[in-house]
């Protein structure tokens, strides 16, 4: 075998193996949490909203009110299956259950510790892993835009409708 050819192959192999791994530097600034709340209807739609900080009962109630109104408008029952989170069972929400049922929105609860029965959890995992992984964001706004874009991309790829609910933000006083 030709020595120059072997030397050339060895050099090529060395060059291939000498690639540097990309480094992402973590910024010193620690941002606030971006929470997402959503309703998924498999292969049909994903309705979601973003909140800086935690999702409170007002945001949850707003989403449920919209779902109840839509159920009443189209005259078709809607069923929401959810976990037993404190927001889902707080006093203010419980008072609205009969109103929502009269509009055609029914709420059922999963047994505790059954995340595998919540398709929305799988959707959030894919959003993080497939659309957001390996990225750094300067602030919460950049992260929010990336989440919005990621949800839209997943909707297009999965051929389902996405709709973002916009919650009123409370201006700082």
Where in the sequence are the language-model features?
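Acidic/histidine-rich, metal-coordinating catalytic segments
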Residues: 1-2, 75-89, 118
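Extended, low-complexity cationic-aromatic segments
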Residues: 1-66, 167-168, 173
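A short acidic, often aromatic-flanked loop/helix-cap motif at beta-alpha or helix-coil junctions
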Residues: 5-6, 113-117, 143
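Short aromatic-enriched loop/helix-cap "lid" or pocket-rim segments at secondary-structure transitions
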Residues: 9-13, 92-94, 119-122
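RNase H-like polynucleotidyl transferase catalytic core
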Residues: 22-28, 100-119, 136
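Short, basic/hydrophobic alpha-helical segments
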Residues: 60-79
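Short, aromatic/basic amphipathic alpha-helical patches
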Residues: 91-101
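C-terminal anion-handling pockets and recognition modules
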Residues: 120-173
């Amino acid at each position: 075998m030709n020595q120059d050819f072997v030397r050339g192959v060895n050099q090529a192999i060395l060059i291939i193996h000498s690639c540097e791994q990309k480094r992402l530097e973590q910024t010193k600034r620690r941002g606030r949490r971006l929470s997402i709340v959503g309703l998924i209807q498999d292969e049909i739609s994903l309705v979601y909203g973003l909140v800086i900080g935690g999702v409170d009962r007002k945001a949850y109630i707003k989403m449920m009110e919209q779902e109840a109104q839509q159920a009443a408008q189209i005259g078709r029952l809607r069923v929401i299956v959810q976990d037993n989170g404190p927001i889902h069972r707080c006093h203010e929400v419980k008072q609205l259950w009969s109103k929502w049922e009269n509009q055609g929105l029914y709420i059922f609860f999963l047994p505790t510790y059954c995340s595998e029965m919540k398709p929305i959890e799988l959707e959030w995992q894919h959003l993080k892993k497939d659309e957001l992984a390996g990225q750094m964001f300067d602030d919460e706004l950049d992260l929010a835009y990336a989440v919005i874009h990621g949800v839209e991309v997943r909707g297009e790829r999965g051929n389902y409708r996405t709709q973002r609910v916009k919650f009123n933000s409370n201006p700082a006083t």
